[in-house]
């Protein structure tokens, strides 16, 4: 198909990306650990972690996981907020040859049970604050190994110990729990896992771009939560697509390793996860915000040092602007405000740009596409109200109910094809048959219109279908 949108790409944005430059996502990680060892990777509550530390910690945890006798490709669940433990755990799982299953820490017992049972996860790394929820359902799942993290595990010996004490005993944010140990089930503290893993060796694993990296759960286009099967190829492609698209906004920084991105969106969310992995590739760093709903503390974090990229959702931007301390934030270094998760309103975007000097750039994507789909050019000077152009190596087609492509300017279902698009829903053959068209496009359930310049907008109303937008980027 003709890619009419390419003519509107900003200078420097590639038309295509090549995931084959890496043999796997873990190859990308190993390269980053080698090339950026002494660079900072993240900061959380003023505790820094370098790439060298991320390498060592994830290597230790990966070795420990292997020592539990897990089969290659086993699913390991992660139920953590934006703490340093998240990246360590994610990298450990992948380096050990397993599959990550991201879990929303605020899930109810019913939601948690469904996801653990559907994925077949045999292990879980969970913050102790949420262990009481796990206790309710663990007997109905295949979980055999529980790694129990505390908030202060990676925040330094003194500050970390104090934070854990404060959360447990002062704020009383850790409900009482008792995880059953029958049937050989193990419960091990995060710190003990790292200590034991340091005495072990991480065994090399043979992984390809076609191995499964993540089961990313989503409502899908309809029905119950489903696991989108995201391969190493899908994730590597998404990283390269995001990097290519964002570069025009960030290139003025010079050394991309100096980029400071604010990670306020939860890392179990596919867009934040992709940006975390982009930071690993680039050697840049993340400022982790464990609880962005505490806007006072969030603003204090934003005031601590210059930041260059701020992804968020409409409600987050609105709440920030309404806070009395908002005007004390220095936005002079902000190069990119990336909006998604829900439709950004023109009023919010106009107010944000007036207050910060940064245009709000809106995009669209899904868990099924690694959060990558369309995005407005990052060189855009003002909010557009549409969802932008397809990113490198992505094709967007507007199709009718029979899967036939419609002429430019017609309203129909937005369908997407590209190396970042999932291979299907986990153990859902009937759903997969309905989700993909004969020519390999994925039906998104969103209704839109593409204009002659290649820009797409979500249709406000459509007479044949009434479906919620899956916009998440």
Q: Model-derived features: where do they sit?
A:
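Conserved pre-ATP/AMP-binding loop-to-beta segment of ANL
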Residues: 174, 178-217, 224, 249-260
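Gly/Ser/Thr-rich phosphate-binding loop
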Residues: 162, 304-312, 321-382, 395
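Structural core segment of the AMP-binding/adenylate-forming
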Residues: 67-68, 95-192
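Conserved AMP-binding/adenylation subdomain of ANL enzymes
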Residues: 236-260, 268-308, 323
């Amino acid at each position: 198909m003709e890619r009419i949108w390419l003519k509107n790409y900003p200078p420097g944005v590639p038309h295509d990306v090549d995931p084959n430059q890496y043999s796997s996502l873990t190859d990308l990680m190993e390269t980053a650990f080698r090339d950026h060892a002494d660079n900072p990777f993240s900061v959380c509550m003023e505790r820094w972690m370098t790439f060298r530390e991320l390498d060592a910690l994830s290597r230790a945890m990966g070795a420990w996981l292997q020592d539990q006798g897990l089969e290659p490709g086993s699913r390991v669940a992660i139920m953590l907020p934006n703490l340093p433990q998240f990246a360590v755990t994610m990298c450990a799982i992948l380096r050990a040859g397993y599959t990550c299953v991201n879990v929303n820490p605020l899930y109810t017992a019913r939601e948690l049970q469904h996801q653990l049972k559907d994925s077949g996860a045999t292990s879980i790394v969970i913050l102790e604050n949420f262990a009481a929820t796990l206790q309710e359902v663990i007997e109905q799942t295949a979980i055999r190994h529980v790694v129990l993290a505390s908030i202060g595990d990676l925040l330094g010996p003194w500050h970390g110990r104090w934070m854990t004490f404060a959360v447990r005993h002062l704020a009383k944010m850790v409900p009482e729990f008792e995880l059953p140990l029958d049937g050989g089930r193990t419960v091990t503290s995060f710190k003990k896992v790292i200590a034991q893993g340091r005495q072990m060796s991480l065994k090399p694993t043979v992984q390809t771009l076609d191995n499964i990296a993540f089961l990313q759960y989503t409502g899908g286009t309809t029905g119950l939560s489903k696991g989108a099967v995201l391969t190493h190829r899908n994730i590597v492609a998404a990283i390269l697509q995001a990097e290519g698209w964002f570069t025009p906004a960030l290139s003025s920084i010079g050394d991309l390793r100096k980029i400071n991105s604010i990670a306020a969106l939860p890392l179990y969310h596919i867009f934040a996860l992709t940006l975390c992995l982009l930071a690993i590739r680039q050697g840049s760093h993340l400022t982790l915000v464990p609880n962005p709903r505490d806007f006072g503390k969030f603003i204090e974090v934003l005031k601590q040092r210059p930041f260059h990229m701020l992804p968020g959702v409409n409600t987050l931007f609105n709440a920030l602007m309404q806070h009395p301390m908002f005007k004390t934030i220095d936005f002079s270094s902000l190069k990119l405000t990336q909006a998604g998760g829900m439709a950004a309103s023109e009023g919010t975007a106009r107010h944000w740009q007036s207050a910060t000097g940064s245009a709000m750039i809106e995009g669209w994507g899904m868990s099924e596409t690694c959060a990558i789909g369309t995005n407005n050019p990052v060189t855009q000077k003002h909010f557009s109200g549409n969802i932008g152009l397809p990113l490198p190596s992505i094709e967007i087609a507007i199709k009718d109910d029979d899967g036939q492509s419609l002429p430019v300017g017609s309203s129909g279902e937005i369908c997407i094809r590209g190396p970042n698009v999932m291979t299907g829903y986990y153990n859902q053959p009937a759903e997969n048959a309905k989700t993909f068209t004969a020519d390999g496009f994925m039906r998104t359930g969103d209704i839109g219109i593409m204009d002659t310049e290649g820009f797409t907008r979500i249709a406000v109303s459509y007479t044949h279908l009434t479906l919620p937008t899956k916009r998440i980027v």
